[in-house]
Amino acid sequence: DEAMALSTLRLAWSEGVLEREASIKSMVQLAAARGIPDHAARMIESGFEQGLLPRDETFVRLLANAWVSAKENKLAIGAFRRLSEIAKNGEPLVRVANLYLEMGQWQQAEQALEKAIDLGLDDAGSAYLLLGIVLAEQDNYKESFVALRRARSFEKTQRQAAKWLSYAEDMRKQYEWQRAYRG
């Protein structure tokens, strides 16, 4: 069973006899499956430090996802940033943006999305949509409308972007009204 397999692999790891990349990967995946993703992440980092694991796309992605599962957003952000550098694309930075949003850090999310778009994405429409939302939430309506219009130009995000454009316009009107009556 999984618990026994994990125990066996952990013992081999602690005794320093677990050196094969595939075995370490199995142990990491079992730890994550058993609900101890923080342990899995620490094993990966230890494998990196000991030179047992390559700092490649596969293992850095495993590390990032383990930190997400462990609810260690700051550590996950660092791992996803490294993954973006290794993969040479912006997909991991969209994950970074989402983690920043979970933490209520709008500006950091905006920066991550802009960099993700610059690096290139398979699903740029969703990134533009999210960027438009982030900008609207920061009362930056002019740039929000630009991003949302870009999102509307992609078939996948066309409907959502159109709805957000309407909503952002309402937000802008309310914002302008509040500014006019406060002053």
What are these regions, as identified by a protein language model?
Residues D1-G183:
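Alpha-solenoid helical repeat scaffolds
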